[in-house]
């Protein structure tokens, strides 16, 4: 059963400029394993994290560090969640998080669907 959906779009060049202007931005938004990726990949991961927050209903108190985009053995993206994000997901009955990301023509997009068992 679908529990939530979220989508986000990020302008890659604008994100890159923000990251250059604000040295603490990348460490605040991304887990250590994500930080060395190129701007287009970071922008897509930021869009993914924004989309996940929307899919979870936009709760406050979430740490960006509690959401990490990882790749499985086939290269497919997924989330590793912890802390408040994991607690909110569990409280909302979320048992699966589906993620799709793309970047093209200067834009990064992400779409998230959260699922859970029927009540």
Swiss-Prot record:
The record ties this protein, via Pfam families, to:
ACPS
Query: What's any GO biological process attached to this entry?
Result: fatty acid biosynthetic process
Q: Which cofactor does it need?
A: Mg(2+)
According to its UniProt record, which reaction does this protein catalyse? apo-[ACP] + CoA = holo-[ACP] + adenosine 3',5'-bisphosphate + H(+)
Q: What is its EC number?
A: 2.7.8.7
Q: What residues does Mg(2+) bind to?
A: 8, 50
A cellular component term from Gene Ontology for this protein is:
cytoplasm
What is the top EC class of this enzyme, as a single word? transferase
Task: Alphabetically list the UniProt keywords.
Answer: Cytoplasm, Fatty acid biosynthesis, Fatty acid metabolism, Lipid biosynthesis, Lipid metabolism, Magnesium, Metal-binding, Transferase
* A Gene Ontology molecular function term of the record: magnesium ion binding
* Major location (coarse): cytoplasm
- Cellular compartment(s): Cytoplasm
Give the highest taxon in the source lineage: Bacteria
Family of the protein in this entry: Belongs to the P-Pant transferase superfamily. AcpS family.
As for what it does, the entry says: Transfers the 4'-phosphopantetheine moiety from coenzyme A to a Ser of acyl-carrier-protein.
Q: Can you say what this protein is called?
A: Holo-[acyl-carrier-protein] synthase
Q: Which organism is it from?
A: Clavibacter michiganensis subsp. michiganensis (strain NCPPB 382)
